[in-house]
Amino acid sequence: MAKASEHFFYVLKCSDNSYYGGYTTDVIRREAEHNAGIRCKYTKTRRPVKVIHFEKFETRSEATKAEAAFKKLSRKNKDAYLIQREESE
């Protein structure tokens, strides 16, 4: 279980192969909410979804900035971002 002081930017892969980036304090809970259709407009019709990437940040501000930057990327650049992050782990 995540501590309240943990902040995450996460990426879901949807059933239509699109990506959804979001912010949460608990990645496991948020994935379950997306799959249950709770508090999610975009992913509700694209279930099931799966967390394919997440990053931990010290502050909410840092995590939401990472989310906003990811959402601005083209699909090609999102793919490259995810590959680069996977290779660096």
UniProtKB/Swiss-Prot annotation:
PROSITE patterns listed in its UniProt record: GIY_YIG (PS50164)
Sequence intervals crossing the membrane: none
Domain of life: Bacteria
CDD domains: GIY-YIG_UPF0213
Family matches, as Pfam families: GIY-YIG
Domain GIY-YIG: 5-80
InterPro entries, per database record: GIY-YIG_endonuc (IPR000305), GIY-YIG_endonuc_sf (IPR035901), UPF0213_domain (IPR050190)
Family stated for the protein in its record: Belongs to the UPF0213 family.
Annotated protein name in UniProt: UPF0213 protein LMOf2365_0181
